[in-house]
Amino acid sequence: MAVYVVDHPLVRHKIGILRMESTSTSEFRSVSNEVARLLIYEATKGFRTEKHTVQGWAGPVEIEAISGKKVTVVPILRAGLGLMDGVLDMIPGAKISVVGLYRNEETLEPVEYYVKLASDMDQRLAIILDPMLATGGSLIATIELLKRHGCRQICSLNLVCAPEGIAKVEAAHPDVDIYTAAIDDHLNEQGYIIPGLGDAGDRIFGTK
């Protein structure tokens, strides 16, 4: 398993905006998608391309097009929806799969309540979207669900990760790579990332 921290001035600046308590719901939502665009840029660096000759404005021209890669974007409801538009801006042809999980606030374990996956999961790269990788429970549950449906190419996009969550995912699924904007210090007793962003789902959707 590889963990890629996308260390770029724009990413650091935008994560700083997301950390601010004063950031409005609309700004939090838009900046989350901006960071998602930067993360997906890094996550797709390994895509292969093929050369084609097409008709350009001044005659035939050789171009490169992505080849041999079927993608499904997998937002974990509900917070993962806050990254989806940014990713789809860059990969508009991706299919959307949806996994609904919520965290039991007493046990901190994920509870599954909805699943709708794209077809041919065994042929697709699944890009899981979840703003916060905290305990790792939701991500591990989603990875296991995808693997049960035949998916073998999986990576995760997260705005912020906790070291504890990364360690759990690595132990359970060492074949899954993680792309993140930041690795924070630790989890508190309630399972929230410190310093973190707060509850990303509430901040994206304007709820408490």
Swiss-Prot record:
The keyword Transferase applies. It catalyses: UMP + diphosphate = 5-phospho-alpha-D-ribose 1-diphosphate + uracil. GO terms for molecular function: GTP binding; magnesium ion binding; uracil phosphoribosyltransferase activity. Uracil binds at residues 193, 198-200. 5-phospho-alpha-D-ribose 1-diphosphate binds at residues 78, 103, 130-138, 199. It is an enzyme of class 2 (transferase). Belongs to the UPRTase family. This is Uracil phosphoribosyltransferase. It comes from Desulfovibrio desulfuricans (strain ATCC 27774 / DSM 6949 / MB). The gene is upp.
